[in-house]
């Protein structure tokens, strides 16, 4: 099975851009699975559409959509809609894996955001025995959030594949620069890339940006 689960240390850290960058560089057939899209109305483009816009041809699958920008379980309850359950997400990933070389499962928010009454993205990773890539922001406060995410993965016996900074500022401050050294230490996982802020602005240049910003383990050429 070639499934990679992508989570973040929180919202707006660049998960979708990182997912698109990995998809853009991956050889073979790629599927992107978004279990629950929140904060997007019917008919509007969601995260999987953004991945396809940036990465090119991928199989894009969205299991559920809720209009309010809330945690999936809360958004489903308020919409009067059924929640997405981790078992459903895992089964959808397995089905996609049968016909694709890589399946990227993008979470909503952080690792322990609830999909239903108790299930989270961590439960999806456990069910799939899949590694998890953590997307973090680069600035002050990221070390604690990244360390807690890695600790939650270890407690469940899930491999933390690495950390990627999803939106690196054009003028990084001292905290940002120090965090590049400290993130691998506090998570016990390799730093696998740093994507610049605004990476999604130009789809024509996105492949080059992805290649420059991701480490060889993810198909790029970035290194510390």
Curated annotation (Swiss-Prot):
It is found in: Cytoplasm. The active site is at 34. Pathway: Cofactor biosynthesis; biotin biosynthesis; biotin from 7,8-diaminononanoate: step 1/2. It comes from Saccharopolyspora erythraea (strain ATCC 11635 / DSM 40517 / JCM 4748 / NBRC 13426 / NCIMB 8594 / NRRL 2338). Homodimer. Catalyzes a mechanistically unusual reaction, the ATP-dependent insertion of CO2 between the N7 and N8 nitrogen atoms of 7,8-diaminopelargonic acid (DAPA, also called 7,8-diammoniononanoate) to form a ureido ring. Its cofactor is Mg(2+). GO terms for cellular component: cytosol. Belongs to the dethiobiotin synthetase family. GO terms for molecular function: ATP binding; dethiobiotin synthase activity; magnesium ion binding. One of its GO terms (biological process) is biotin biosynthetic process. Mg(2+) binds at residues 16, 47, 106. This is ATP-dependent dethiobiotin synthetase BioD. The keyword Magnesium applies. Its main location: cytoplasm. It catalyses: (7R,8S)-7,8-diammoniononanoate + CO2 + ATP = (4R,5S)-dethiobiotin + ADP + phosphate + 3 H(+). Its EC number is 6.3.3.3. Gene3D superfamilies: P-loop containing nucleotide triphosphate hydrolases. It comes from the Bacteria. Keywords: ATP-binding, Biotin biosynthesis, Cytoplasm, Ligase, Magnesium, Metal-binding, Nucleotide-binding.
